[in-house]
A protein has these predicted regions:
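His/Asp/Glu-rich, glycine-adjacent segments
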Residues: 1-167
């Protein structure tokens, strides 16, 4: 309906391949049926287009989360070779093996029944307040115009928090 080309390249290792670039599959780092990943090689497709594909997936599934993610310096072929079957049969991209985290990593978490326009950060930003999203929060919460400080290193995240608190 949305005009995407969707195939299942390997019925023995079933996942969806969208427009020969984007993989839609289970998240193999969580319990069965909880999260779908929409993974992409960002040198071949803009993140905004991957996000549109992710939003299409989000509208059509009832899992808790759809995670849209991608990285640069990743080929479509390498991404496809990163698809694995877990011991319990779950099939998905092994994200660390896919190299999406290494360069130009972008991610957006799309929760079930959650609209960013009704979340506190967006409401605060619309009322003229400064909003800063630090660490993993900048991945999980979407707020247009927010200051973003990505990071997983605890020391850097704490420095960013203290810096932002000093500027409030």
């Amino acid at each position: 309906k949305e005009g995407y080309k969707v195939t299942i390249p390997n019925p023995e290792l079933p996942y969806l391949l969208v427009n020969d670039l984007v993989i839609v599959a289970d998240n193999i780092e969580t319990d069965y049926g909880q999260i779908y990943n929409v993974s992409a090689p960002l040198d071949y497709i803009p993140f905004e287009e991957v996000l549109k594909i992710g939003q299409c997936v989000r509208k059509n599934v009832r899992v808790n989360r759809v995670i849209v993610l991608g990285g640069e310096n990743v080929t479509p072929e390498h991404l496809q070779r990163s698809v694995e079957r877990r011991e319990d049969g779950l099939v998905g991209v092994n994200s660390p093996k896919s190299n999406v985290y290494k360069q130009g990593y972008q991610v957006r978490h799309l929760g079930f029944g959650i609209s960013p326009e009704f979340q506190l950060p967006t409401l605060a930003k619309k009322s003229g307040m400064e909003v800063s999203l630090i660490g993993k929060m900048q991945d999980v919460i979407y707020c247009e115009g927010a200051n973003r400080f990505p990071g997983v290193d605890t020391e850097q995240v704490m420095k960013d928090i203290l810096h932002e608190m000093d500027n409030v």
